[in-house]
Regions:
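Membrane-water interface at transmembrane helix exits
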Residues: 53-57, 86, 90-94, 116, ...
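Selected alpha-helical membrane-embedding segments in polytopic membrane proteins
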Residues: 2-104
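Terminal transmembrane helical module of multi-pass membrane proteins
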Residues: 121-184
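Amphipathic alpha-helical interface surfaces
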Residues: 85, 98-99, 111, 115, ...
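Hydrophobic alpha-helical transmembrane segments in multi-pass membrane proteins
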Residues: 41-50, 79, 109, 113-117, ...
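Cytoplasmic-side transmembrane-helix entry/capping segments in multi-pass membrane proteins
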Residues: 98-107, 160-164
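C-terminal halves and exits of single transmembrane alpha-helices
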Residues: 81-82, 108-127, 182-184
């Protein structure tokens, strides 16, 4: 399948997953090529990430030339570190056969998730105060639930193991953020 058609089909599958429809999985290319092509989602979501980075950049960060570079480093590491950790984790969980499909789904789902993050972040900033904070907190809970939904669906795990995978992903994100902040 040509890349453009695969992107379109995969985005439709991601939209279905975004609506909590398990049928979205059938729109992904579950081959080795499909696995590697799913990382093109990082390029598609990049403009949204850049807008968010600019929205959340403080005046002090804006004055440093390393600010956007560190944001980009964090973004890139986020797309690489979790799949690498999952290579080990799916072995521990005895789910190696579902690894590629899981990463494919997580990668493509990132596009509607980044879209949601952009919209909710903008609304949260516009509303400000406690209402804005509640928007952001609600967003975080929803994103974690998306991770839970896809993890449980694709890896076919029980509740406890699914939560473990989601928490490991969250801890990796926090660790990467702390690492990047220490470099700035």
């Amino acid at each position: 399948m040509p890349l453009r058609a695969e992107i379109t089909t995969s985005l439709f599958g991601a939209w279905r997953l975004f609506k909590f429809d398990p049928g979205g999985m059938k729109y992904f290319n579950h081959t080795a090529d499909g696995f590697w092509r799913s990382f093109s989602a990082a390029l598609i979501a990049l403009p949204m990430f850049l807008v968010l980075s600019i929205l959340h950049t403080t005046d002090a960060e804006a004055g440093r030339s390393t600010g956007i570079g560190l944001h980009l480093l964090r973004y890139g590491l986020g797309w690489v570190v979790f799949p690498i950790v999952m290579v080990w984790l799916v072995q521990v969980l005895e789910r190696r056969g579902q690894y590629a499909s899981y990463i494919i789904a997580i990668n493509w789902l990132a596009i509607p998730q980044w879209t949601l993050v952009l919209v909710v972040s903008y609304l949260g900033m516009a509303l400000g105060g406690i209402v804005g904070d509640l928007f952001v907190l609600s967003l975080l809970m929803l994103l974690l639930y998306y991770d839970y939904f896809v993890t449980r669906l694709v890896l076919d795990l029980g509740v406890g193991k699914t939560i473990l995978v989601v928490v490991i992903g969250l801890l990796l994100a926090v660790l990467l953020d702390a690492l990047i902040l220490s470099l700035g």
